[in-house]
């Protein structure tokens, strides 16, 4: 953990009040049933959050938006709706930025850059959040989530401990997740384009 970020009270809350937190449970039984669909769920949260922040809320129901996003990933083999042998399926860590870009274009959300994936360190996550970005976080072998994709909207430091403001796709509200470097894998950064 990096020392300069551990000042108690330090926060990044640019997105507070605009965060969406749909869950995988809301979409699991759609169509033929979705499996390993945390990636499309996180991107659905992202699309709703950015559209709301831009003052152009989506008129489509979340289920319709989710289906379109899962379809975008499925057509490009970025998202596979399978859980073959509990090993294969879900959203590709490396290709998720392409799925995010295409999803934003599909819903008319412009003016944002999608960069990554990068190694997800506390320093990088906090620096990007301080710049007003949203961080799409991918964790591997997490003690609670296992392999999982979710959104990070901000952070706070309490008692020297970094707490990330997460839409984890499991809980229908934003909540704080204690951060430890060993828990992070990759991150993709979604931020306002400069100029």
Q: Where are the regions that the model predicts?
A:
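Catalytic cysteine-centered active-site loop
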Residues: 106-122
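Stable alpha-helical elements in mature extracytoplasmic
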Residues: 34, 39-46, 96-100, 121, ...
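Short secondary-structure junctions and interdomain/linker hinges
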Residues: 76, 107, 132-139
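C-terminal domain-closing interface element
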Residues: 83-110
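Active-site-adjacent structural segments surrounding the nucleophilic cysteine of cysteine proteases
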Residues: 1-89, 158, 194
